[in-house]
Amino acid sequence: MKAFIFELCVETLPAAQAAELGGADRIELCDRLDIGGVTPGEKLISATIQALSIPVHVLIRPRGGDFAYSAAEFEQIRLQVHRIKQLGAAGVALGVLLTDGRVDEVRSRELVELAHPMKVTFHRAFDRTPDLSEALEAVIRAGADCLLTSGGEPNVLSGAKQLKRMVIQAGDRIPIMAGGGLRLASMAEVLEQTGLHCLHGSLTRRAVDGPPESGHGRTAAEILVADVRTAVGLMQGHFAAKMI
């Protein structure tokens, strides 16, 4: 079994293809990352699944804003889970909270069961909960396969101490995946401080080296491939050093 997982969050097919070319273990496919992400369209989901050989996980979020959903919104989520499973996705990322901010275990468990055999990541709705320790137990009880979190902080580096506590609390019951403000410059520090084996990021940045037609610049896709390779290389180096 591989020592680590690097998941890239993308919202276009070229970015998804760049993720695979760069060595990402899987992608999370989203739309509207500018508002925190919502469920992408079926055409993009289908095209991405067909184009990639690595696992495609799909964000399920019907709207921006909070994660306490009405009955109609929850039914929409259920339908999206069912349809994405039909399309052949390997997994979904979702999160449902109660109006008081706690994890909605009943609805979450229902979605996990509906999604099977797809893998289910409980996403960063988790970071909105008032008690992260109890929320972790709720996510485990709901049957999720992975938890994506920044440790309740704006970014994974500032949440590193909490992430380490969560890794210890979770043990081998659920993988903790750090995501939120992940930067190449801080990846090694995050891994060292937390004991994590799974990282999630978008690694987005502007292609500033010049336009592709100049012959001196790189396209956004080429930059992303290079960044993913750097991220994967950093993780490989970290875990190789741990084995010495």
Feature map (PLM): residue ranges:
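Catalytic cores of alpha/beta
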Residues: E11-L21, A68-V81, D127-A142, L163-A178, ...
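Alpha-helix-loop-beta-strand connector modules within alpha/beta enzyme cores
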Residues: G37-G64, V103-A125, S158-L184, T219-M243
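Glycine-rich phosphate-binding active-site loops on the catalytic face of alpha/beta enzymes
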Residues: R26-V38, R83-T99, A144-G159, R183, ...
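Active-site beta->alpha loop and helix N-cap motifs at the rims of alpha/beta catalytic domains
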Residues: L13-A15, A24-R26, V38-T39, I45-E105
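N-terminal amphipathic alpha-helix/helix-capping segment at the start of soluble metabolic enzymes
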Residues: M1-C9, L13, I49-Q50, F239, ...
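Hydrophobic faces of well-ordered beta-strands that scaffold small-molecule active sites
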Residues: F4-V10, I27-L29, V56-I60, V92-L94, ...
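A short, Lys/Arg-enriched amphipathic alpha-helix followed by its capping loop at the start of a domain
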Residues: K2-F6, A18-D25
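Hydrophobic, well-structured mid-protein blocks that either form specific transmembrane helices
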Residues: K85-A142
